[in-house]
From Swiss-Prot:
Family, as annotated: Belongs to the ATP22 family.
Membrane topology field: Peripheral membrane protein
Location of the protein in the cell: Mitochondrion inner membrane
Entry keywords, A to Z: Membrane, Mitochondrion, Mitochondrion inner membrane, Transit peptide, Translation regulation
GO molecular function: translation regulator activity
Source organism: Candida glabrata (strain ATCC 2001 / BCRC 20586 / JCM 3761 / NBRC 0622 / NRRL Y-65 / CBS 138)
Protein name from the UniProt record: Mitochondrial translation factor ATP22
CC per GO annotation: mitochondrial inner membrane; mitochondrion
The protein's role, per its UniProt record: Translation factor specific for subunit 6 of the mitochondrial ATPase. Required for assembly of the CF(0) component of the ATPase.
One GO term of the biological process aspect: mitochondrial ATP synthesis coupled electron transport
Principal place of residence: mitochondrion
InterPro entries: Atp22
Lineage top rank: taxon: Eukaryota
Length: 573
């Protein structure tokens, strides 16, 4: 029957001899006649409008070309009446997304029509919702409506929407054309929306139970190796919602509710690593070194992590608030106390996570210490931790390649010396000392976008010209690539020394290296010297004052590096 109806509708659409207004009326007449043969009308009234809708009956699946014609020729002022007409006559709304999205963001009465709330307000007309909502909308459109209502904190009819979604899933489960992956994705999307509702409602216990169940389901599903962006987004959404829940409730200890789910055997190391790194990044926002230590010990691979932290001088600082190391007996006592207070067994994670999280521990501890210690005590703390770190690295330099030895910890220490302690000279001395240990440095990998040399050289007036050249020679010796910060500093320094030709050579390096010229200080110098900006430079930035300034920002590349690796892996599988 629908094949014949669609043929008639298409003939009307393609008839060039008929004006668009007349076409619209003919299309409506054909749809109305088709719908009236299989449906009965029910009338519902609101204070602003009258909505009439059919009850049961078949769904009319109009040809997509007919919907396209509607998209082009139905005026904005008629969107509401058009959409109401489609609902009234049982037209499937999958291809009416233009009207759907517009009404969702329109007036209150338009929103009520798109969400079918108009049929729920009056109990006498709720049957229309029960019979039509799940039949006229796709599953994803139903979820979109549900999420939009939750975002508005409109929980009045949650049970109706959840019942409709459950009914839709049950019907789709019997569709033999759908794959196992389709069913898994549908279930995960539904749970994501349910988590969002529990988050917004503030039901933490139910949120945690639902979250753990979903993570365990994901780990046993066949979707983890999918390269679909839609699938990846669905898989990672529960983690984002969990992070939102932690921050909303300001309850960092709840993060350990996640650990049992992390311990579940996963088909995908990528997904497991993403969970671990996301939790670590979240913990950092609470700026609590004890909390980070607790999490790091639960995610550590092997049993020697407390010993490592003791060798690095971190354990005594975090646990006892004092510098130095403690004896093995005291360390074991501390460890026993920790295990007794925290009954969480070790987690399995990617091998490199240990180093990434170690860098995070340094970052959190130094950030916290800079706010509670006096400047003199914090200075001693930075020097003490650096000394223990390089001593450990030199003693274990033959093992460092397997340990993924990089510049993460050094960057964190240098950052806090320069921008928290405000001691540029000490930062220079630490950098020179580190790269003066030749046998150790040969094992170092510069994995961060902002290398240690950039951290020290950028806008550092205490570094003399002679010292600057010595640092550049060190970079060349160890194949450390030039960064924008270093090139900009050289341009600025040489212009101050009245060496415009050499300064221009460094500016040329910036252009040849492909660095994006958006820095306010550099653009100002270029304009002052009459040099040419790159041909692709957006001159609107000058008028809108949208140029960048390289500010004092903590280097987060080491933790972000793992997340980027995860994304790349997920895209490549």
């Amino acid at each position: 029957m629908m094949g014949r109806v669609n043929s008639q509708l298409l003939r009307v659409v393609q008839d060039r001899s008929v004006a668009n207004g007349e076409k619209l009326q003919r299309l409506y007449k054909l749809i109305s006649a088709t719908g009236s043969k299989t449906a009965t009308a029910t009338t519902t009234a609101t204070t602003t409008t009258t909505a009439t809708a059919t009850g049961g009956g078949r769904v009319l699946a109009l040809d997509s070309h007919v919907h396209r014609w509607f998209n082009t020729h139905v005026r904005g002022s008629k969107f509401y009446s058009h959409y109401h007409f489609l609902i009234k006559h049982g037209v499937h709304l999958a291809h009416a997304t233009r009207f759907f999205n517009k009404l969702l963001t329109g007036s209150e009465v338009e929103f009520q029509l798109a969400t079918f709330q108009i049929f729920l307000i009056n109990e006498e007309n709720q049957q229309v919702f029960f019979e039509k909502f799940h039949r006229l909308y796709t599953f994803d459109m139903m979820l979109q409506i549900f999420d939009r209502l939750i975002a508005r904190r409109d929980f009045r009819y949650v049970k109706f929407y959840l019942a409709a979604l459950t009914r839709k899933m049950s019907e789709l489960a019997t569709d033999r054309t759908r794959t196992v992956q389709d069913a898994e994705l549908m279930y995960i999307k539904f749970n994501n929306s349910l988590l969002y509702y529990l988050l917004m409602e503030g039901n933490v216990p139910m949120f945690l139970r639902t979250f753990k169940n979903e993570v365990e389901y994901i780990k046993s599903s066949t979707l983890q190796n999918s390269d679909s962006a839609e699938v990846q987004q669905a898989l990672l959404k529960p983690v984002h919602l969990f992070v939102q829940m932690l921050r909303k409730n300001n309850s960092p200890d709840l993060i350990f509710e996640l650990l049992p789910a992390l311990q579940t055997k996963s088909r995908s190391k990528v997904f497991n690593a993403y969970l671990t790194s996301t939790v670590a990044s979240t913990i950092r926002t609470f700026n609590d070194p004890t909390l980070m230590l607790k999490f790091l010990l639960t995610t550590a691979k092997g049993t020697k992590f407390p010993e490592l932290l003791n060798e690095l001088g971190l354990w005594r600082y975090i646990v006892h608030g004092e510098p130095g190391k403690i004896d093995p007996k005291s360390l074991q006592e501390d460890r026993d106390k920790f295990e007794k207070a925290n009954s969480v067994s070790a987690l399995k994670a990617m091998k490199r996570v240990d180093v990434v999280l170690l860098t995070e521990l340094y970052r959190v501890f130094l950030s916290y210490s800079s706010s509670v210690m006096s400047p003199d005590k914090f200075r001693h703390c930075c020097i003490d931790l650096y000394s223990h770190y390089v001593q450990f690295c030199e003693q274990n330099k033959h093992k460092l390649r397997g340990w993924k030895f990089d510049t993460g910890v050094l960057n964190v220490i240098l950052y806090h010396i320069r921008y928290r302690l405000r001691d540029d000279k000490l930062a220079y001395e630490v950098l020179v000392d580190f790269y003066g240990r030749e046998s150790m440095v040969q094992s170092v990998k510069n994995t961060a976008k902002k290398c240690p040399f950039s951290m020290v050289i950028y806008d550092n007036g205490t570094v003399t010209t002679q010292q600057l050249h010595a640092l550049l020679q060190l970079m060349q010796r160890y194949n450390v690539p030039l960064s924008f910060q270093i090139c900009y500093t050289m341009v600025k320094r040489l212009l101050q020394m009245n060496e415009p030709e050499q300064a221009f050579e460094w500016y040329t390096r910036i252009l040849e290296s492909g660095f994006d010229v958006r820095h306010h200080g550099l653009v100002e110098l270029v304009l002052q010297q009459g040099w040419s900006l790159p041909h692709h430079f957006n001159h609107d930035l000058l008028e809108d004052d949208k140029l960048d300034s390289i500010i004092e920002e903590e280097p987060t590349e080491e933790c972000a590096e793992l997340v980027e690796d995860v994304k790349e892996l997920m895209q490549s599988v």
